């Protein structure tokens, strides 16, 4: 099945290891299939992104070990141009159709959205709850801000935003913005930028948390 052309936008706690966890570990795959997305080819003259970004999919299992989280993670596609970004975004299920406890992530380069990854371990996330009727809007706006490097001036000189995530939960959904250096969070204006981008959204339970402060953090191994 050929992918339809991309629609260009206007300019501008972990469960103990066991059979139940193993049975639930498989994350859903986009209906078009990862194989078809892998067949995407950059278009001549495509607008390059400042950095490549990788879409990931997973399903969070309370109590899962770091190894189980890593094995549950599914790479969707690494995008390097604006056109390929929209081709992928438009051809994976909308976040509103994902099952409970599933998440999408967009991470810089090909780094994985795992707390204990060496390149992530000293960082953390800004985390906020989103009303379900606003999830799609918030996720899309954060994606565009991320690939457009709109957070570049919102982090300290030795820090950077390296990813965004959206997770489907019971009452409200959860969005997260990842940075690489938790010790410099006091100098960041990431939340101010998010409020500027989404002035009409009422976020709940907004806070920052270093990965190393999670009770399930397995330092040196490798999830959100």
UniProtKB/Swiss-Prot annotation:
UniProt biased composition (Low complexity): 1-27
UniProt keyword list: Initiation factor, Protein biosynthesis, RNA-binding, Translation regulation
Top-rank lineage group of the source organism: Eukaryota
Pfam family membership, one: IF4E
Entry-linked InterPro entries: TIF_eIF4e-like, TIF_eIF_4E
Single GO term (MF): RNA 7-methylguanosine cap binding
Family: Belongs to the eukaryotic initiation factor 4E family.
Quaternary structure annotation from Swiss-Prot or TrEMBL: eIF4F is a multi-subunit complex, the composition of which varies with external and internal environmental conditions. It is composed of at least eIF4A, eIF4E and eIF4G. EIF4E3 interacts with EIF4G1, but not with EIF4EBP1, EIF4EBP2 and EIF4EBP3.
This protein's name: Eukaryotic translation initiation factor 4E type 3
Lineage: Eukaryota, Metazoa, Chordata, Craniata, Vertebrata
